[in-house]
Amino acid sequence: MILLPCGILKNREFCTFEKMSTLLKRARETLTIEIAGLEELRERLDHEFEQAVNLLYDCQGKVILAGMGKSGLIAQKIAATLTSTGTPALFLHAGESSHGDLGIITSQDAVITFSYSGETDEVLQMIGHINALGVPMIAITGNPDSALAKASTVHLSVAVDKEACPLGLAPTASSTATLALGDALAMCLLEKRQFSEDDFALFHPGGIWDAS
């Protein structure tokens, strides 16, 4: 039997081809589940997505993206993508928002809130302030019946049939779908703004990129 080293393990254990096959099976199943989630998302896109793009395009200020936990991390990446492709955006940590950081939102801005359950307390606590400013809010959740979805100007669903996590607990397929939806918003805005390669270069003076 051929043995493959697995790294530093107790009692110098080794991985057999059978064990490696199990690992590959899990990896492929993970990707299959996440691909299925993306396909669901693609087929679900409708006029609400177009409404969200137009809302962000018409924004006279900046786009504020807010979330907690894994949703917050995804929101940070989407904020960076928007900013680098012609749509000024900032991430607002929902947990810090009620301790003074709500001041970053102005009446000229638009807000995108992220919560897969749509019931994250720290995110829901922001709604009163957002409404008081009359700021439009796009909610990205996995539950159209959630409090966050119902309070939004536009709701975009990232619901998935199941997570890739075998425990059904860790955000995997849902976080991938959320990230992809953010990319879709950013690329539609890029195209709508006629954002060019020269514009991209202007925003990336310290980077190495290939425009060929």
Predicted regions: what they are:
Residues 21, 146, 207-208:
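Serine-centered coil/turn micro-motif
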